[in-house]
Design a protein with these regions (language model features):
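Glycine-rich phosphate-binding loops of nucleotide-dependent enzymes
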Residues: 1-168
């Protein structure tokens, strides 16, 4: 599982090195920088597959710190996928992104959700409406509504909590 609001990449390492470290962790040898190049390069094929899957092929040699914000989120998804989780926790994965990056990350989330459960906290309603099968709306620690987007978005308690009585 991984949360997004704090960047979780090594900014001075390349995209490939970041994913390779995550793969090392999966093998039980995380952050083993002293391994031979041969041993580390054994991970490169799978690392490249993950990099391709998240659309970062053209950034493989770039350091993570050089990546645009949305591409860093894609790298975080790649490093998470390297661990082959059954569930991913995404905390506002599109916060602060441009429209183009939101679309790219939403498509990527849709793709990875096909093979695992994704639990997402998100305030961008267009992202919620396109990605979510089941929605739970919380306000002040209380569950206001649960269901699909249509039923939740028209629920009077949800409308009141998020839009106020003038919109009801």
């Amino acid at each position: 599982m991984r949360s997004f609001q704090i960047s979780a990449v090594f900014p001075h390492l390349t995209v490939l090195e970041n994913v390779r470290i995550a793969l090392q962790r999966r093998r039980g040898s995380s952050l083993d920088f002293w391994r031979s190049d041969r041993v580390l390069h054994e991970l490169d094929e799978r690392a490249q597959e993950l990099i391709d899957a998240v659309g970062l092929s053209s950034f493989v040699g770039s350091t993570a710190g050089e990546l645009p914000y949305g591409r860093k989120r894609a790298l975080e998804i790649a490093t998470t996928l390297a661990l082959d989780p059954e569930m991913m926790l995404l905390d506002e994965p599109t916060a602060g992104m441009t429209h183009e990056d939101v679309e790219r990350i939403a498509a990527l989330i849709r793709k990875v959700a096909a093979n695992r459960t994704v639990l997402m906290v998100e305030h961008n309603l267009s992202v919620v409406s396109t990605l979510s099968d089941q929605i739970t709306v919380l306000a002040r620690g209380e569950v206001l509504a649960e269901g699909d987007y249509q039923s939740v978005s028209t629920n009077p308690k949800v409308v009141e909590a998020y839009l106020g009585t003038a919109h009801g």
